[in-house]
């Protein structure tokens, strides 16, 4: 099978690796893969070393004539079976480029919300009539997309991004950096804060936690609107604002558990995956794909979205029972390895592509 990918690989290594390694594995299995991306992306050297053809081609805007011309020439002359676009810039350009070629256009969707039939821009991406199939990062995203597509709802499918535990094995950040010891119980929340992240719910939940050994680390940017709420928390002195960090996986490995109080918009949260890979359990909400990663009462806790008291209750269950933290953490790591592994992702992609080619 001959496949052309249009995506960006200029993000953090851990964020692009599940996607990038999938295409490398396809080449190892005998498929021909070409990737159109920024030529200076860090992953380009690895792609080429592994036999992936790379074209230095990335659109500057949603309709970029130069990109369309380059991709059309590649699709036409290369006789590709599948072309696969990953974002709001690459999908429209790939759609125009695929006109007059035999390539089936597949798109990727990674978040819930934001796709509407009344929005003209949606017809440049997932609602474009050229789209033959949509691959979603979670069942929550799939169900959301199916509400909005006009036809072929059965060709909107879930394929989880695959992971390998070895990708995430990192040394733990030292607790002493935050003035903490092994006697303390630590929860970490990593986010680039916006309203959908539910930080107010988390801070409200701290009003219902009463354990002097419990500390909360808030990792990332954008917490400023919540400073007054944090000051009003009874455990304000044990809430640590540590800013943007390059070692988030190491912090997750150090924490006893991680918390994600999101109220909307989540696809399949990477912070939960990084925590699972390092054997760290989670407290999450029912929004988006989080419940697909966390088995409630087995690998962590899933609580109703926006319910601060329920969130606090789940945290308290872990704070007061370290054996449960250990039990859930082991189970979380095993679940990631079993249900979200890279080999399954490649298998499901190829099966879906083959299905589209038969139609």
List each language-model region with its residue ranges.
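A short helix/loop element that forms part of the nucleotide-sugar donor recognition site in Leloir-type
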Residues: 168-180, 329, 348
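Short hydrophobic beta-strand element within catalytic cores of glycosyltransferases
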Residues: 36-37, 281-284, 294
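Short His-centered aromatic/hydrophobic patch
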Residues: 85-91, 109
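Nucleotide-activated donor-binding/catalytic signature segment of Leloir-type glycosyltransferases, i.e.
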Residues: 227-245
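Conserved acidic donor-binding segment of nucleotide-sugar-dependent glycosyltransferases
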Residues: 295-297, 301-308, 317-323
């Amino acid at each position: 099978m001959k496949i052309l990918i249009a995506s960006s690989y200029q993000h953090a290594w851990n964020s692009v690796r599940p996607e990038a390694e999938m295409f490398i594995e396809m080449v190892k299995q005998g498929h021909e893969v070409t990737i159109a991306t920024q030529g200076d992306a860090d992953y380009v050297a690895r792609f080429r070393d592994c036999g992936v053809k790379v074209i230095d081609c990335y659109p500057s805007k949603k309709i970029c004539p130069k990109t369309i011309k380059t991709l059309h020439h590649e699709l036409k002359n290369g006789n590709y079976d599948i072309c696969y676009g990953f974002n709001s810039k690459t999908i429209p350009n790939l759609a125009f480029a695929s006109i007059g070629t035999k390539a089936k256009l597949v798109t990727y969707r990674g978040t819930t919300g934001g796709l509407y039939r009344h929005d003209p821009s949606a017809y440049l991406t997932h609602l474009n009539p050229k789209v033959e199939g949509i691959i979603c990062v979670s069942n929550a995203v799939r169900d959301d997309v199916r509400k909005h597509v006009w036809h072929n709802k059965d060709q909107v499918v879930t394929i989880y991004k695959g992971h390998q535990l070895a990708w995430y094995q990192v040394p733990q950040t030292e607790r002493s950096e935050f003035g903490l010891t092994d006697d303390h119980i630590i929860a970490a929340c990593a986010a680039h804060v916006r309203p959908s992240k539910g930080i107010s719910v988390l801070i409200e939940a701290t009003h219902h936690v009463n354990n002097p050994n419990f500390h909360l680390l808030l990792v990332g940017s954008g917490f400023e609107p919540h400073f007054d709420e944090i000051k009003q928390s009874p455990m304000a002195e044990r809430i640590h604002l540590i800013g943007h960090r390059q070692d988030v996986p190491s912090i997750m490995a150090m924490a006893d558990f991680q918390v994600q109080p999101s109220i909307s918009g989540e696809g399949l949260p990477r912070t939960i995956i990084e925590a699972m890979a390092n054997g760290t359990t989670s407290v999450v909400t029912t929004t988006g794909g989080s419940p697909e990663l966390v088995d409630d009462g087995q690998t962590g806790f899933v609580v109703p979205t926006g319910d601060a008291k329920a969130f606090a209750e789940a945290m308290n269950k872990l704070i007061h029972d370290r054996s449960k933290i250990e039990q859930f953490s082991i189970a979380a790591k095993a679940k990631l390895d079993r249900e979200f592994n890279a080999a399954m992702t490649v298998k499901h992609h190829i099966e879906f592509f083959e299905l589209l080619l038969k139609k």
